[in-house]
C-alpha cells in the first residue's frame, strides 16, 4: 500500500524543479490523496558556479548532499538527471527507476546560423568536455567557451558573452519550453550524448519496500536497459565530469545497440565503436564495449586526462 505522504529530494534549479514536479504530478495522479512534498537541497555543483565542472573534480557534484539527506531519513526519494548520477552509490541507496528518455540529442541555439555554416573561429558556449571534444574533432577552428549556470542563464550568455552559438541538451530545453529557440539538433553521429542524457533516475533506500512498490511504475524497461549499458561503460572507464566520455544505447526488440566514445579534451585523439547484443545483458555489453575502447587507445587517453593509470582489469561488483 502506498504511503500517505512522500518527500522528494531535489536540487533547486529550474530544470530540477520541473523534473521533481513532474514526478510529483504523476504520483498524485496515480495515488489520489497522497501528500507529496518537494524538499530543495543545495549541492556542491550548485554552489561552485565560477569554475568549470572538469576542474572542480570528484563525482556526485549534483547528488551527494541529496543522498546524505536520504540517509538521514529527511527524504524518501530523489529525482536526478541521469547524466548527473555517479555509477556507485552510498551503502543502502540505489537507483530503482529510470524513466522514459526524452530527446537524447544535443541542441544548438545560434543567431540563425546552422552548425555547418558557423564562421571560421566562431565562439561556442558549452559546459561539457565530451561536446567540446566531439565538436573540435570536426571543427578544430572553433573556439570553445565554458559556460555554467541554469538553462536560461546559458541561453542568455549567447548575447551576454557575444557567442556565436551555445550547445545544450535538447531534453532540458524541451522540458522548460525553450524548444522554439533551437536552431538545430545535432545528430548523435556528430555529438554522441552524455551517459543517461534525457532520462530521469529515481533513487531510494533499498530496504524501503513500500517506497519501491510505490515508484516502480516510473521505470521504462527499454530506457533502463540502454542507460544501464551506458553507465556500465562509464563505470569501467572510471569516468566523471573531468573526462570526455559519451555513450548512447538504443533498444530494438530484444537487441541493444550501444555506441561509445572516448577522446582527449581537444578532440585530436579519439576512439569510437559500437556493439550489439541481447538487451538482457545490457551491463555486460557496456563493459565489453569499454574494454574494446580501452584496448583501442582509450586507456592511454584516459591515463593522460586523469594523470594516473586506469585499471587494466576491473572486477564487476556482485
UniProtKB/Swiss-Prot annotation:
- Might you give the EC number(s) for this enzyme? 2.5.1.61
At the top of the EC hierarchy, this enzyme's class is transferase
NCBIfam families associated with the record: hemC (TIGR00212)
Q: What's the source species for this entry?
A: Geobacter metallireducens (strain ATCC 53774 / DSM 7210 / GS-15)
Q: According to its UniProt record, in which pathway does this protein act?
A: Porphyrin-containing compound metabolism; protoporphyrin-IX biosynthesis; coproporphyrinogen-III from 5-aminolevulinate: step 2/4
Instruction: Provide the cofactor list for this protein.
Output: dipyrromethane
User: Which InterPro entries did the record assign?
Assistant: HemC (IPR000860), Porphobilin_deaminase_cofac_BS (IPR022419), Porphobilin_deaminase_N (IPR022417), Porphobilinogen_deaminase_C (IPR022418), Porphobilinogen_deaminase_C_sf (IPR036803)
| One Gene Ontology term of the molecular function aspect | hydroxymethylbilane synthase activity
GO-annotated cellular components: cytoplasm
**What other note does the entry give for this protein?**
The porphobilinogen subunits are added to the dipyrromethane group.
Query: Which family is it part of?
Result: Belongs to the HMBS family.
Q: How is the cofactor bound?
A: Binds 1 dipyrromethane group covalently.
| Signal peptide (residue range) | none
State how it assembles.
Monomer.
- Please verify whether the record's keywords include Transmembrane: no
What is the reaction catalyzed?
Answer: 4 porphobilinogen + H2O = hydroxymethylbilane + 4 NH4(+)
Q: S-(dipyrrolylmethanemethyl)cysteine: which positions carry it?
A: 241
Q: Which GO terms describe its biological process?
A: protoporphyrinogen IX biosynthetic process
The record's annotation in Gene3D superfamilies points to: Periplasmic binding protein-like II (3.40.190.10), Porphobilinogen deaminase, C-terminal domain (3.30.160.40)
Fetch the CDD domains from UniProt.
Answer: PBP2_EcHMBS_like (cd13646)
Its annotated function is as follows: Tetrapolymerization of the monopyrrole PBG into the hydroxymethylbilane pre-uroporphyrinogen in several discrete steps.
Q: Which UniProt keywords apply?
A: Porphyrin biosynthesis, Transferase
The answer to keyword Transcription regulation applying to this record is no
Gene from which the chain derives = hemC
Pfam families linked to this entry: Porphobil_deam (PF01379), Porphobil_deamC (PF03900)
The name under which this protein is listed is: Porphobilinogen deaminase
Question: Where is the chain membrane-spanning?
Answer: none
